[in-house]
From Swiss-Prot:
Enzyme Commission number(s): 1.2.1.8
Protein source organism: Vibrio atlanticus (strain LGP32) (Vibrio splendidus (strain Mel32))
Residues annotated with Cysteine sulfenic acid (-SOH) modification: 281
Pathway: Amine and polyamine biosynthesis; betaine biosynthesis via choline pathway; betaine from betaine aldehyde: step 1/1
Cofactor list: K(+)
Record carries keyword Cytoplasm: no
Pfam families registered for this protein in UniProt: Aldedh
Annotated catalytic residues: 159, 247, 281, 459
UniProt name for this protein: Betaine aldehyde dehydrogenase
Length: 486
């Protein structure tokens, strides 16, 4: 596939660094496209373009901006299948997921913030008969979005939607593992009427990200990725006092009580570990099951997990796709071997799939370990693959303590038919995204983000729009100025 690498000032352009990288199809190891790494000059061009675009975009009324964003939503939905197919080739995830979720959920978020944009307003308060003040919610300026490789186009839309709705410009850097669909999103924004420069795309590795996080003309950075990189991004951003949003890693607990609907609990645990072949930051990889239903749970879990279809992601029957890269495949397989050595019981899975034409891809069979303990490496560390750890519990207070005993705090879930217990337990979970009797839903209206080392700030929901604004206070004197000097 031939394509320009960058999108700057309303058009696709080539990078000028002379360096290139190759996007690889995770399902077969074949190259998809060769792209150019952005140079410092390219990044400067993107920033200068964004300044010009911001001047035009921020001067528009919120209703005018909303109309353009809604037009982009219309185009995105019309091209859902084409975009989903490209996303599958780039990520290795099953087409049945991408065609239903990835583009659609991102378009929903743009639509949500387009509708919310005209509600941005300030306050007014009288101070005396002759004096009052009012406030304005003003855009920050140029924002940087740095995406991850598991949901490339969805993340690009989640980050650009509130930024653009509030009147900002955005420079977006997708992961170098999945660079393709962000360029398509930029084209669609332009087609919808977005002024040139308001959404630019630069490509490359961590060096390009560092150019953005260090640049004094970038007002805010929104980053999705692993916690170690997030710390570095936040540190770089602090040098110029940038606002930051960080959506980072997790090792989330799911607690299944003895009165839970067993079928639902098993279904949710499978979704929470095997959807997108386990490459989801909110995965509920620590599944705590009450001792009285433990055997029934793992019996059903084993039977149903072994029926999952792993194969060519482009086949609509496929439920488990390919991991993003050979390097990541090796990390997941290493984590599985450590789990075996730790004393956990391998219930099912535990190996790379190489038959049925999958030998050149990065396929790992859905894997479940039982008889796990909290101090085992695979229970403590984020694996980001299709690996579930099942642990027993008997006491409510004890399982709450165990569930919270982690450096992460992204998500948590509780399964019970006791409404009082559901609220009591979920209120004690140290996590930013919590579910009761379900897992994984993330509607545009709901703020999402982490506690502890899982992040800073929120994405989606009404408060996120405010994160892309700054408050200006204006005091008005209607009478004579009272000078303290004669």
């Amino acid at each position: 596939m031939e394509m320009n690498s960058l999108y700057i000032d309303g058009k696709a352009v080539d990078a000028t660094s002379g360096e290139t990288f190759v996007s690889i199809n995770p399902a077969n190891g074949e190259p998809i496209a060769t792209l150019g790494q952005a140079s410092s000059a390219d990044v400067e061009n993107a920033i200068e373009s964004a300044k010009r675009g911001f001047a035009v975009w921020s001067a528009m009324t919120a209703v005018e901006r909303s109309r353009i964003l809604l037009k982009a939503v219309e185009i995105l939905r019309a091209r859902n299948n084409d975009l989903a197919n490209l996303e599958v080739v780039d990520t290795g995830k099953p087409l049945q997921e991408a065609i239903e979720v990835d583009v659609a959920s991102g378009a929903d978020v743009i639509e949500y913030f387009a509708g919310l944009a005209p509600t941005l307003q300030g306050d007014q308060q009288p101070l005396s008969d002759t004096q009052f003040f009012y406030t304005r919610r003003e855009p920050l300026g140029i924002c940087a979005g740095i995406g991850a490789w598991n949901y490339p186009i969805q993340i690009a839309m989640w980050k650009s939607a509130p930024a653009l709705a509030a009147g900002n410009a955005m420079i977006f850097k997708p992961s170098e593992e999945t660079p393709l669909t962000a360029l398509k999103l930029a084209e669609i924004f332009t087609e919808a009427g977005l002024p040139d420069g308001v959404f630019n795309v630069v490509q490359g590795d961590y060096r390009v990200g560092q150019m953005l996080t260090a640049h004094p003309d970038i007002a805010k950075v929104s980053f999705t990725g692993e916690t170690g990189t997030g710390k570095a991004v936040m540190s770089d951003s602090a040098k110029t006092l940038k606002s930051v949003t960080m959506e980072l890693g997790g090792k989330s607990p799911m607690i299944i009580f003895d009165d839970a609907k067993l079928d639902d609990a098993v279904s949710a645990s499978m979704v929470a570990n095997f959807y997108t072949q386990g490459e989801v930051c909110t995965n509920g990889t620590r599944v705590y099951v009450h001792e009285s239903i433990y055997n029934d749970f793992i019996d059903q879990l084993k039977t149903r997990t072994e029926k999952l279809i792993i194969g060519n992601p482009m086949d609509m029957e496929t439920q488990i796709g390919a991991l993003i890269s050979k390097e990541h495949l090796s990390k997941v397989l290493e984590a599985i071997e450590l789990a075996k050595q730790s004393g956990a019981t391998l219930l099912t899975g535990g190996y790379q799939v190489t038959d049925n034409g999958l030998a050149n891809g990065n396929f790992v069979i859905p894997t479940v370990f039982t008889d796990c303990h909290d101090d085992m490496p695979h229970v403590q560390q984020e694996i980001f693959g299709p690996v579930m750890s099942v642990l027993k519990f008997t006491d409510e207070d004890d399982v709450i303590r165990r569930a919270n005993d982690t450096q992460y705090g992204l998500a948590a879930g509780v399964f019970t038919q006791n409404l009082s217990r559901a609220h009591r337990v979920i209120h004690q979970m140290q996590a930013g995204i919590c579910w009761v009797n379900t897992w994984g839903d993330s509607p545009a209206e709901m703020p999402v983000g982490g506690y502890k080392l899982s992040g800073v700030g929120r994405e989606n929901g009404p408060e996120t729009l405010l994160h892309y604004t700054q408050t200006k206070s204006i005091l008005i004197e209607l009478g004579d100025y009272a000078s303290p000097y004669a």
